[in-house]
């Protein structure tokens, strides 16, 4: 074996001082000295358990010892009598075996492929051992789950990702999906449970046994977000539910994830065979599927954006030419041809590479280079993680860990290791780009067009010198353009830009100036773009993005020219520049029913336990989607109603994710309220009022929300830290408000206003559904009933949603005195106008002035409250356009008036959207919209002025 390098020999003296009693420097073998110097994890472990070191010194780990893991664990669990002792034994066993694997890996006693197998077998052994012990315990407590024929039902566990592929890294999360075969009930227990409840409780206990940190550490971080519907879906699904989901709703990325899916503890019984057969058609298509390339290209772009977003330098997994790109290369062939070529259906990467070579899908030399690069990168990754049992793929910056890795990788020193790594990653990147790369390049014509602007940029030409290229501009615009360029150059002198940044900027600016200055509005556009550039000049990756992708630069210029709001957003949040890379998605917002799924996929890249990154990711997703909606709005591909629909669906997806995150955090701390043991759902609802409730959000709208629960009195939570159930829901609502309003580097998520709750700011933040109903019936003012017209549940389980809808319908269909209602609605409108009146009397406030949007909303609300007791169908919708439609359909308002009000309403809202894109206030000249205003005022007089 390789002797320790000089830096590590020096560090050995520090190790000696920490050796457990009974071990001396002279009593240890060279092997022990090497491992304990290399890995702090191994050193800490043998200090706590000196017998492990003696065991390793007497008999080295063997390549095939994974075959004994199940037997060893069975012995360890033989005396376990409760969940606490189970958790202790699982953690003890995992640490002991991980030390053995670290020993074998550091000393190269077994090859790197075997190390990956051992790590995967260990995880599988622990998962299956914990499941089987807990299944038996749950059966003793609640009976055995059976189908209607009385056949016992098992819990099947799909290991995803590297666990499924038998390629787990040293310190890794495990991605799991739980399933059970058939519906039914438990038999033989103290009381019957349906199978869904049984397996959900079993799944929760299994996750806790593996994932929960204790004084002994944890076994594995368990990630369940790959299951159907992610965190918002059931924890465990029946086979039928799984099949329905993957047939009807399975996404491309879920198909890729399923390639590596493997049943944990698969004994090839009938249930296992059924599940495998059910999933196979979803993963491997019978035809050759070339759509995969674009889907994987999109995923590649997502990862590239992630690297930029998080500043992931020196990342051997996600960086260019890293492990993820090798995985993508292999998946391309699996997903295109796997349905026709069984040899490509392997879950493991290296056997699939062999199949790719055998089928001549890649040149032999490329396959050989990919194999060498993969084994090199995986060894480097595992060594890096085994130093501290830490989940990282980023190369270290300190000298000690660099010396450790250089020695472990058999390099003379760190520079030599980096050189070898660079060569391997360059080979991977080359093959990757040839296969699915889509980098753009300048054409000779573009170079020729930008050449005169190189002089303008680099030589700081005076006005006379630059006249030919700016001749099409007016004198004032020409002077302004040159001043902007000169001021920008002065600003750059104050910034710490490195040589690479200067070089990229000098490549970029001639192209940018050529495009901007060919426009009639060159001065305005350049004035919006230079602040953005000033903000990113020290972040070379963004300059490179604009320089290397001319299409992205063109879209940047077009959008900044069209909207100062977009320019401001891009300047404030440069990561949004990534959205400019794909015009196919930039001007085509996410489908209205797909926001939740896209957000779920986006959040999967962020560790579930990292709250800070989760908050950032939520904000970044929202900003990216807002940009796409605004771009489509500017391009004219989205009418005003659709703009608001998209903004509303986006907000609902964000609400869903925030509630999920808050719920997860609260349940981890307190458990869940015990009344939920007897029912599905969370007993919690979020009601949207105002623009959210009415599907009418604008670009900068806040969210009017109230929170409801159905928790009975005297219910406690079932966690280790018990609290009152209603207190749980109050803290949940407070947590939700916190997650929305916390300001991160990406800003806040939404401004949230909860003052529409019963008793307003003086009332409880969260209200029971019964108390809400009582308040609405006996205490609420007329204006609160008006607000209820535009209210709907935006998050909640079906039971609470139905309860709220019943309350809303009951209130709205209550018979009212027409004159009294007319007076109260009119007086409320007059109060609003006095309080929020237009301060610019020479301007028309589109929302607040007479004949504006609010008048139309009040007309609709008044008519619903006035006539819904006769025409209950008026309560169906919460948005003004469909309410006006209902009023016409039910004979309350004639069709011509309803249509005219609808046109006026959408016209005024369209103008508000476009003013927002221009960062202008919501008022216009008094002469504007005179026809619409006159029509609205006439309708107001007809319905709301007493006769």
Curated annotation (Swiss-Prot):
| Swiss-Prot/TrEMBL catalytic activity | [glutamine synthetase]-O(4)-(5'-adenylyl)-L-tyrosine + phosphate = [glutamine synthetase]-L-tyrosine + ADP; [glutamine synthetase]-L-tyrosine + ATP = [glutamine synthetase]-O(4)-(5'-adenylyl)-L-tyrosine + diphosphate
Q: Which gene encodes it?
A: glnE
Query: GO molecular function terms here?
Result: [glutamate-ammonia-ligase] adenylyltransferase activity; [glutamine synthetase]-adenylyl-L-tyrosine phosphorylase activity; ATP binding; magnesium ion binding
Keyword Translocase appears in the UniProt entry: no
- Region of interest: Adenylyl removase: 1-440
Q: Which UniProt keywords apply?
A: ATP-binding, Magnesium, Multifunctional enzyme, Nucleotide-binding, Nucleotidyltransferase, Transferase
Gene3D superfamilies associated with the record:
1.20.120.1510, Beta Polymerase, domain 2, Glutamine synthase adenylyltransferase GlnE, Nucleotidyltransferases domain 2
Where does this protein come from, organism-wise?
Answer: Salmonella newport (strain SL254)
For this entry, the protein name equals Bifunctional glutamine synthetase adenylyltransferase/adenylyl-removing enzyme
The entry's family comment says: Belongs to the GlnE family.
List this protein's GO terms for biological process. Answer: regulation of glutamine family amino acid metabolic process
Query: What GO cellular-component annotations does this UniProt entry give?
Result: cytosol
The protein's matches in SUPFAM superfamilies, at most eight in alphabetical order, are given as: Nucleotidyltransferase, Nucleotidyltransferase substrate binding subunit/domain
* EC number, UniProt record: 2.7.7.89, 2.7.7.42
Note down the stretches annotated as region Adenylyl transferase.
Answer: 450-947
Q: Which InterPro entries match?
A: GlnE, GlnE_rpt_dom, NT_sf, PII_UdlTrfase/GS_AdlTrfase
Q: Provide the cofactor list for this protein.
A: Mg(2+)
The record's listing under Pfam families reads: GlnD_UR_UTase, GlnE
Function per UniProt: Involved in the regulation of glutamine synthetase GlnA, a key enzyme in the process to assimilate ammonia. When cellular nitrogen levels are high, the C-terminal adenylyl transferase (AT) inactivates GlnA by covalent transfer of an adenylyl group from ATP to specific tyrosine residue of GlnA, thus reducing its activity. Conversely, when nitrogen levels are low, the N-terminal adenylyl removase (AR) activates GlnA by removing the adenylyl group by phosphorolysis, increasing its activity.
């Amino acid at each position: 074996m390789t002797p320790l390098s000089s830096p590590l020999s020096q560090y050995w003296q520090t190790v000696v001082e920490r050796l457990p009693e009974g071990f001396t420097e002279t009593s240890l073998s060279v092997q022990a000295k090497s491992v304990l110097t290399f890995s702090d994890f191994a050193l800490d472990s043998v200090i706590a358990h000196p017998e492990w070191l003696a065991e390793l010194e007497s008999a080295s780990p063997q390549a095939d010892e994974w075959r004994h893991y199940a037997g060893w664990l069975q012995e360890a669990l033989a005396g376990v009598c409760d969940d606490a002792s189970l958790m202790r034994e699982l953690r003890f066993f995992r640490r002991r075996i991980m030390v053995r694997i670290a020993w074998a890996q550091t000393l190269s006693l077994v090859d790197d492929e075997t190390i990956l197998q051992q790590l995967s077998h260990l995880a599988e052994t622990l998962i299956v051992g914990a499941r089987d012990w807990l299944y038996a315990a749950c059966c003793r407590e609640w009976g055995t789950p059976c189908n209607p024929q009385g056949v016992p039902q098992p819990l099947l566990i799909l290991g995803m990702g590297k666990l499924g592929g038998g390629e787990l890294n040293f310190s890794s999360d495990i991605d799991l999906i739980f399933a059970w075969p058939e519906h039914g009930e438990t038999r033989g227990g103290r009381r019957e449970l349906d199978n869904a409840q049984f397996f959900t409780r079993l799944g929760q206990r299994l996750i806790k046994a593996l994932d929960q940190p204790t004084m002994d550490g944890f076994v594995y971080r368990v990630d369940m977000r790959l299951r159907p519907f992610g965190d918002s879906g059931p924890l465990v699904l029946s086979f039928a539910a799984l099949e329905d989901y993957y047939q009807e709703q399975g996404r491309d990325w879920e198909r890729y994830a399923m390639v590596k899916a493997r049943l944990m503890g698969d004994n090839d019984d009938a249930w296992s065979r059924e599940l495998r057969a059910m999933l196979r058609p979803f993963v491997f298509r019978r035809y050759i599927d070339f759509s995969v390339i674009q889907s994987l290209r999109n995923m590649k772009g997502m990862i590239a954006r992630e690297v930029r977003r998080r500043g992931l330098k020196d990342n051997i997994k996600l960086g260019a030419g890293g492990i993820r790109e090798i995985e993508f290369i292999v998946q391309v062939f699996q997903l295109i041809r796997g349905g026709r070529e069984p040899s490509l259906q392997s879950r493991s990467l290296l056997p699939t590479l062999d199949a790719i070579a055998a089928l001549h899908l890649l040149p032999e030399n490329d396959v050989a280079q990919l194999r060498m690069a993969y084994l090199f990168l995986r060894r480097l990754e595992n060594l890096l993680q085994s130093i501290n049992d830490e989940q990282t793929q980023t190369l270290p910056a300190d000298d000690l860990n660099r010396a450790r890795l250089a020695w472990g990788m058999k390099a003379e020193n760190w520079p030599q290791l980096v050189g070898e790594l660079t060569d391997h990653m360059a080979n991977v990147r080359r093959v990757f780009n040839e296969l699915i790369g889509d980098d753009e390049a300048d054409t000779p014509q573009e170079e020729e067009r930008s050449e005169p602007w190189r002089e303008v940029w680099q030589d700081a030409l005076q006005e006379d010198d630059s006249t030919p290229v700016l001749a099409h501009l007016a004198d004032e615009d020409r002077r302004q353009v040159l001043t902007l360029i000169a001021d920008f150059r002065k600003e750059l002198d104050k910034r710490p830009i490195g040589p690479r940044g200067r070089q990229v900027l000098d490549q970029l600016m001639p192209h940018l100036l050529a495009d901007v200055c060919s426009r009639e509005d060159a001065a305005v556009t350049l004035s919006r773009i230079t602040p953005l550039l000033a903000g990113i000049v020290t972040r070379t990756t963004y300059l490179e993005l604009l320089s290397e992708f001319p299409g992205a630069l063109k879209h940047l210029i077009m959008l900044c020219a069209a909207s100062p709001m977009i320019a401001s957003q891009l300047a404030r949040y440069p990561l949004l520049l990534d959205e400019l890379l794909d015009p196919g998605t930039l001007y085509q917002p996410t489908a209205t029913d797909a926001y939740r799924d896209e957000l779920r996929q986006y959040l999967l890249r962020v560790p579930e336990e990292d709250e800070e990154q989760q908050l950032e990711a939520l904000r970044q997703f929202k900003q990216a989607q807002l940009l796409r909606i605004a771009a489509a709005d500017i391009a004219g591909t989205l009418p005003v109603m659709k703009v608001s629909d998209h903004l509303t669906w986006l907000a609902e997806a964000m609400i869903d994710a925030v509630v999920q995150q808050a719920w997860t955090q609260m349940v981890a701390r307190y458990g869940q309220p015990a009344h939920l043991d007897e029912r599905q759902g969370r007993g919690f609802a979020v009601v949207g009022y105002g623009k959210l409730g009415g599907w009418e959000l604008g670009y900068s709208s806040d969210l009017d929300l109230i929170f409801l629960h159905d928790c009975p009195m005297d219910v406690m939570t079932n966690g280790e830290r018990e609290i009152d159930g209603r207190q749980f829901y109050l803290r949940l609502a407070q947590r939700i408000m916190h997650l929305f309003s916390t300001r991160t580097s990406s800003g806040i998520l939404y401004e949230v206003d909860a003052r529409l709750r019963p008793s307003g700011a003086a009332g409880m933040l969260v209200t029971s559904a019964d108390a809400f109903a009582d308040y609405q019936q006996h205490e609420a003012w007329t204006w609160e009933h008006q607000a209820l017209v535009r209210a709907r549940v935006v998050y909640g389980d079906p039971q609470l949603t139905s309860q709220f809808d019943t309350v809303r319908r009951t209130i709205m269909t209550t018979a009212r005195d027409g004159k009294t209602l007319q007076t109260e609605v009119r007086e409320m409108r007059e109060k609003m106008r006095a309080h929020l009146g237009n301060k610019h009397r020479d301007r028309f406030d589109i929302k607040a002035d007479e004949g504006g949007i609010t008048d139309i909303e009040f007309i609709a609300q008044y008519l619903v409250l006035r006539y819904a007791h006769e025409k209950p169908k008026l309560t169906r919708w919460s948005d003004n356009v469909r309410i006006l439609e209902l009023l016409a359909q039910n004979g309350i308002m004639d069709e011509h008036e309803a249509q005219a009000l609808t046109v006026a309403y959408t016209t005024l809202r369209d103008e508000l959207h476009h003013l927002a894109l221009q960062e202008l206030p919501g008022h216009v000249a008094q002469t504007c919209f005179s026809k619409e205003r006159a029509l609205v005022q006439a309708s107001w007089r007809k319905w709301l002025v007493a006769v």
